[in-house]
Amino acid sequence: MSKHDSVDRDRRALLAAGGAMLGSALWPAGALAQASGAKIPIGTIGAGHIGSTIGGLWVKNGHKVFLSDRHPDELKGLVGELGPLAQAGPIDQAIAFGEAILLTVPYGAIPQIGHDYSAQLKGKVVLDTCNAVAARDGAIADEVEQNGIGVTTQKYFPGVRIVRAFNTLGYTIFAQEANRPDPKLAVPIAGDDPEAVRIAAGLVRDAGFEPVVVGKLADAKLFQRGAPGYGQKVTAAELKQKLSLTQ
């Protein structure tokens, strides 16, 4: 090999390394982790049926999960069942822990949680599973009916990267159908931030399902409670057909 060839080889290696470093600088840590298939830490706000079920599926897939709710001491038994990748504590600690957050509370609590934690959640990917129920949640259910649930959640969480997900089926179905043989159970998702949607899609797959990107947060009304995409225990191809999605 000539000296000139050696210099060219070293130059190409340096350029490749520099490009990788630049790419790392431009991508959020969580996005890089998801792109490489690595497991990111996840926090939950709420640890009821959906929170504990989806959180447990992520633990089984190798994610570290920090569960939180109003009474974290009551989660000790659940943490013991899930094993060393799971822990529990206050909401603020779960938010600090997670590169992504699962939001799973009664929808009537959304305004207060947004008021209390939006600043800490700013810039994070938040998977919103919550459904508005008029008899339980009051006036905010009317707001959801008028404006759509995705847009309404985003209103109360300014600066947060909201993605709607895991809201269409009950926890027992998620528990039973996770990681079934192909074709997997479809989980519709929607969000305004493309990178947040991509990360959420990866987390849906890690839980054992097939994500179906429906569109922006305004399009989440297509699978909110009572809409055509709600309650659909179907494959991705079937869900796309039901919602007239072209992709």
Please annotate each region the language model reported.
Residues 36-39, 60-100, 104-112, 116-120:
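Conserved N-terminal Rossmann-fold NAD(P) cofactor-binding segment
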Residues 130-162:
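Rossmann-fold NAD(P)-binding glycine/threonine-rich loop
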Residues 66, 138-146, 151, 177-195:
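Short beta-strand and adjoining strand-loop segment in the mid-core
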Residues 31-35:
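Boundary at the C-terminal end of the N-terminal hydrophobic targeting segment
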Residues 51-52:
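N-terminal Rossmann-fold NAD(P) dinucleotide-binding loop
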Residues 47:
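Glycine-rich Rossmann-fold phosphate-binding loop(s) that bind the pyrophosphate
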Residues 1-22, 29:
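N-terminal secretory signal peptides and thylakoid transit peptides that target proteins
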Residues 89, 156-162, 180-220, 225-230, ...:
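Internal alpha-helical scaffold of NAD(P)-dependent oxidoreductase catalytic cores
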